[in-house]
């Protein structure tokens, strides 16, 4: 890939409908890899993302962001591809017609028609409710990373990070560079699970090196948040650590309990969902003809898996099956890593018991746990409490309820 050069931003025109051979939704690692794989075919390609620059969450730009070399190379290659148009800070508003979406940015709205579409819509954090989680000073673990990259001042602030998965260590590293004082990294997985995961990392040397670099003396297994304490803002965190309750004074708490695939657009387009992710075949093709998906909207495995899945989808979308097939062994390698990741960091059922009767589950509509516990499902809960009907449209509470109550989220309409 060539050296970094500035990328283009193709804005919308409210007076026209644009036509493309291939439309890619999402400009994270999977979306960029898909565009670059498809570009040599000469197809007219559009890639849209609601962020101001390509890279997704893992390669998010910002005043304090240090983009890795791979991110810079992919950005440069994307900018150099003359048949690829990037629509940054752009969102999908509606499905206007078959093979046609209505898009908008801050200035206008317009339609885009496509022959083939690749969904690279990524994932969002799973946030579970617990007493005090709405206090100022409490954020998601990934949310904290985004704030740090955006320049939020953390110098001297005491920070506790809790939840599950490698993102906790990555968030801690970012916060430490910004001047935060790490007090505890509370991982809910057991020591046995972490040991088994670590023993497998030799199969993926780059991941073993990364884990070694992120290792932190404040990391504890068998630990999870019980409550955030404070009156008007966060003052301390109560943790369960190996069965013992401890309290740690702090100014910030960042929690992340894994990821939830962003499947809403895929579902609205008629793509089948399985195991809470968009279902795909060996070619990354969805159940709907001429629709593909790649990256964490199809399951979680890190940027390496997202990149290879995106490339397979890009090649397959333009008929380059031979090149797509050549990447199958590489995908299998990273899928094996994803399997280990998801197995070893499976959530402890105790986390379902964190919320108390008056703990808010839906923050937008002020719906407490007690108003939901006796409901039979998601639709019943919405009818009786307006849960999930606020500004975030259930992106936070919907995933939490799915985990807490085993509800099935209905297909978006």
Predicted regions and their residues:
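Local cysteine-cluster metal-coordination motifs and their immediate loop/turn environment
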Residues: 358-372, 385-403
């Amino acid at each position: 890939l060539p050296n970094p050069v500035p990328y283009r931003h193709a804005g919308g025109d409210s007076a026209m409908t644009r036509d493309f051979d291939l439309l890619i939704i999402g400009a994270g690692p999977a979306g960029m890899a898909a565009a670059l794989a498809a570009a040599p075919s000469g197809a007219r390609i559009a890639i849209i993302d609601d962020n101001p620059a390509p890279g997704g969450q893992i390669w998010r730009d910002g005043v304090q962001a240090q983009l890795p070399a791979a991110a810079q190379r992919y950005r440069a290659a994307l900018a150099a591809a003359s048949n690829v148009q990037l629509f940054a800070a752009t969102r999908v508003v509606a499905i206007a017609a078959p093979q046609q979406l209505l898009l908008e940015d801050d200035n206008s709205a317009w339609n885009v028609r496509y022959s083939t579409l690749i969904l690279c819509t990524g994932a969002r954090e799973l946030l579970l409710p617990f007493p005090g989680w709405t206090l100022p000073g409490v954020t998601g673990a990934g949310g904290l990373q985004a704030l740090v990259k955006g320049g939020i001042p953390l110098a001297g602030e005491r920070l506790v990070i809790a939840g599950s998965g490698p993102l906790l260590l990555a968030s801690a590293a970012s916060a430490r560079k910004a001047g935060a004082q790490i007090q505890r990294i509370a991982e809910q997985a057991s020591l046995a699970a972490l040991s088994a995961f670590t023993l497998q990392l030799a199969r993926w040397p780059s991941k073993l090196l990364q884990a070694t670099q992120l290792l932190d003396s404040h990391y504890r297994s068998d630990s999870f948040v019980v409550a955030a304490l404070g009156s008007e803002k966060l003052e301390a965190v109560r943790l369960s650590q190996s069965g013992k309750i401890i309290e740690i004074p702090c100014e910030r708490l960042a929690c992340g309990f894994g990821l939830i695939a962003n499947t809403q657009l895929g579902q609205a387009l008629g793509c089948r969902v399985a195991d809470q992710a968009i279902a795909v075949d060996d070619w990354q093709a969805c159940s709907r003809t001429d629709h593909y998906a790649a990256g964490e909207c199809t399951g979680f495995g890190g940027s390496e898996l997202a990149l290879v899945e995106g490339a397979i989808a890009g090649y397959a979308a333009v008929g380059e099956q031979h090149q797509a097939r050549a990447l199958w062994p590489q995908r299998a390698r990273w899928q094996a890593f994803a399997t280990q990741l998801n197995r070893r960091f499976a959530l402890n059922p105790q986390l379902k018991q964190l919320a108390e009767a008056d703990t808010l589950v839906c923050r937008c509509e002020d719906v407490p746990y007690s108003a939901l516990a006796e409901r039979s499902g998601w639709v019943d809960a919405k009818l009786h409490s307006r849960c999930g009907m606020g500004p975030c449209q259930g992106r936070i509470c919907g995933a939490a309820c799915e985990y807490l109550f085993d509800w099935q989220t209905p297909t978006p309409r």
